[in-house]
């Protein structure tokens, strides 16, 4: 298991993007969280099998039907704290 951290920019707040990401992560069996950032971006931390996380990055780039993703910056790392589900933090 590895950890992926991403910062997603574009029109990604107020457009159901975090809910879309939570659904995708849950369906793929990933754990972690997503949260809005003060600068208008969305932060994502996900843990799982490398191949599944790579598939998840495709979902991050695609976005919800109302969103418009400009960029996804991804950082791969070893697992820090472990999570039991994928949550939307407020």
Where do the model's predicted regions map?
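Intrinsically disordered, low-complexity, mixed-charge
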Residues: 1-90
């Amino acid at each position: 298991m590895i950890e992926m951290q991403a910062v997603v920019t574009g029109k990604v707040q107020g457009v159901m993007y975090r809910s879309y990401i939570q659904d995708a992560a849950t369906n793929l069996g990933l754990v972690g969280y997503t949260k809005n950032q003060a600068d208008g971006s969305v932060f994502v931390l996900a843990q799982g099998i490398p191949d599944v996380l790579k598939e998840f990055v495709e979902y991050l780039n695609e976005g919800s039907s109302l969103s418009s993703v400009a960029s996804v910056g991804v950082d791969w790392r070893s697992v820090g704290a472990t999570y039991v589900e994928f949550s939307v933090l407020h």
